[in-house]
Amino acid sequence: YTALNTLSLHDALPIYCLPSYSFGGHDVFGAIPQFTKLYGHTVAIIGGETALSKAMPHIQPVLDKAGINVLDVIPFGGECTFARGKEIAAMDSVKDADFLFAVGGGKAIDTVKVVAVELDDKPFFTIPTIASTCAATSEAAAVYTADHNFDGIAFVNHPPVHCFIDADILVEAPSRYLWAGMGDTIAKHYETLMSARNREQVYNTQLGLVLSSMCSEPILEHGLQAYKDNEIKHRSEAFDLMVMTVIFTTGIVSGCMPGDYNSIIAHAVCYGCATNEETEKHHLHGEMVAYGLLILFIVDKQLDELNRWLPIYREIGWPTKLSQMGLDESYIPQIVEKAVSVRDVVVSPYEITTDMLAEAIRYMETIEC
C-alpha cells in the first residue's frame, strides 16, 4: 500500500494530479460514457446499500444505452478496512472489470481506493451520494479497523478519474451529512496553513494554500443557509456552493498539498474522540473534526479565529463541548494519547504534546457557548 508509514510513489517522485468533475442534477450521469470510454466497457459498482438504491435508477439506464456491462454491484460492507478492500479486490467480477464505480459516502469511496491499490491502480470513478467529505475527489483513504478504530491513511497514486456530482441526490440526503462535511472542510484551510508554516513552499503548495481559503470563507458566509435549505430539501444556490466547497474545493487543496500537510490537530483530536466506540458510532467524522478545529485555535493561540467562528458554531450546532459527543473530561487522556500517536501531528511548526492538547480541551470546556 502507498500508505503514510511506507514508501510510496510520493516519496520517490512528487506527482500532483488535480481531480476532474461533472456537476448537475440527475442529468450529470449522461456524461458517464464520455469519460469511461477510454477505459473499456465493463464495470464493477461498489457502494453503500442506501447509496446504491438512490443512484442506480439514474445510472443503470445510461450504462445500458452506452453498452457498458455491469459485472457486479457490491455493498462495501459498512467500514473502510484493509481486509474488506482485499476481500473485494479478490472477487473475479472486480478483477475482470475494466474500471470501478464508487458510490456513496466517504467510507464507501475510500474502500474502493483500497481496492484500486490492490488491483495495481485500476481506474475508478466516484459518485458521491452525501456531501460529507472530499473523498470523492481526493487521493487519500481514511482506513479503520473492523471495530471502527482509526488504522491509518492510504494513498492511491492519483485521484478518481472523474467525479459525477448529482446535487439532486445530495439534497435529498439527511442534512447532518452536509453539516458534518462543512465542519470537516473548514479545518482544511487552517490545518494546511499550520502544517506548512515556516516551510519552504513550491508552486503546488503555494496554490493549495491560496485555494484553502475557499474551504472556510464560503462556509462562514453561506453555510448556515445551505444547511437550512438542505433540511427542507431545497436545492438552492447556497446548497450547490456548499456541495462544491465540501466535495471539490477541498479535493483540489488535498491534491496540491503533500499528504502530511493536509491535516494536523483538528483531525488528530477527531481520531482521539473516535476511540470511544459510542462516539464513533453516533457522531460523524466532520463533526468531530469541527470540534478539533477549536482545539487547534486554542493550541495555536488563534483566539481571534476562535471568536470569529464560535457564533456560527452555536447557530449551526457543531460541537463545542465534549458532552455533545458523548464524552466528558475523564476521557481526555485517551483523546490526547491517540491524537499525538497519529501521523497528522508529525508535520507541525512545533511539537504537539499531550499536555498541550489536554490543556486546550479543558480550556474549551470553560468557555460559555
Regions of interest found by a model, annotated:
Residues 1-11:
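Single conserved hydrophobic/aromatic residue that forms the stacking wall/gate
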Residues 12-98, 322:
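ATP/NTP phosphate-donor binding region
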Residues 20, 118-211:
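A glycine/threonine-rich phosphate-anchoring loop and its flanking beta-alpha core
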Residues 29, 52-56, 107-114, 134-137, ...:
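Short glycine/serine/threonine-rich phosphate/pyrophosphate-binding segments
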Residues 92-115, 119-130:
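A short, small-residue-rich loop immediately preceding and capping a beta-strand
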Residues 201-312:
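Active-site segments that bind and position negatively charged phosphate/pyrophosphate groups
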Residues 302-369:
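C-terminal charged capping/lid subdomain of soluble metabolic enzymes
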